[in-house]
């Protein structure tokens, strides 16, 4: 019987948990602030990890840039702590990527809500004009 998940998927899940804890407890850079690890993708050889993050202050581009620079600067330290927390032969090289999917999802949701609202308003206007 085939395995349900690849090893890289299981390692990615564990890395996501560990990095979230490390960012919350160990990294003291004020540029980073409130950060959420939304996803982790690990290469098949487990040598590289893309860590997708979002920030609490998503609407401020300069704060996002500063936060990303802080994460890049802290990346070697985070990698060393990750190596201590996990038992891996090779600790992946970490690359932080800002995750815009949440913002895009909210934007799409707002667009759909606006279209529905306009459509309902049009139907109400049509009903009122038919009654006259």
UniProtKB/Swiss-Prot annotation:
A single GO cellular-component term on record: cytosol
Purpose: One of several proteins that assist in the late maturation steps of the functional core of the 30S ribosomal subunit. Associates with free 30S ribosomal subunits (but not with 30S subunits that are part of 70S ribosomes or polysomes). Required for efficient processing of 16S rRNA. May interact with the 5'-terminal helix region of 16S rRNA.
InterPro entries referenced in this protein's UniProt entry, alphabetically: KH_dom-like_a/b, RbfA, RbfA_dom_sf, Ribosome-bd_factorA_CS
Main location class: cytoplasm
GO biological process assignments: maturation of SSU-rRNA
Compartments (UniProt record): Cytoplasm
UniProt-listed Gene3D superfamilies: 3.30.300.20
Record keywords: Cytoplasm, Ribosome biogenesis
Pfam families (alphabetical): RBFA
The keyword Isomerase appears for this protein: no
Superkingdom, taxonomy of origin: Bacteria
Keyword Iron-sulfur: no
HAMAP family to which the protein is assigned, alphabetical: RbfA (MF_00003)
Name assigned to this protein: Ribosome-binding factor A
PANTHER family the UniProt entry points to: RIBOSOME-BINDING FACTOR A, CHLOROPLASTIC-RELATED
């Amino acid at each position: 019987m085939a395995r349900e998940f690849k090893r890289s998927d299981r390692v990615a899940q564990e890395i996501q948990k560990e990095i979230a804890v490390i960012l919350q407890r160990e990294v003291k850079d004020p540029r980073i602030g409130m950060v959420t690890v939304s996803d982790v993708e690990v290469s098949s050889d487990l040598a590289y990890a893309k860590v997708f993050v979002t920030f609490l202050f998503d609407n401020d581009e300069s704060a996002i840039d500063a936060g990303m620079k802080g994460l890049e600067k802290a990346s070697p330290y985070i990698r060393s702590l990750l190596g201590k927390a996990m038992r891996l032969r090779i600790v992946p090289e970490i690359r932080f990527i800002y995750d815009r999917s949440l913002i895009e999802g909210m934007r799409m949701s707002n667009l759909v809500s606006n279209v529905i609202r306009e459509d309902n308003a049009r139907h109400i206007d049509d009903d009122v004009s038919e009654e006259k």
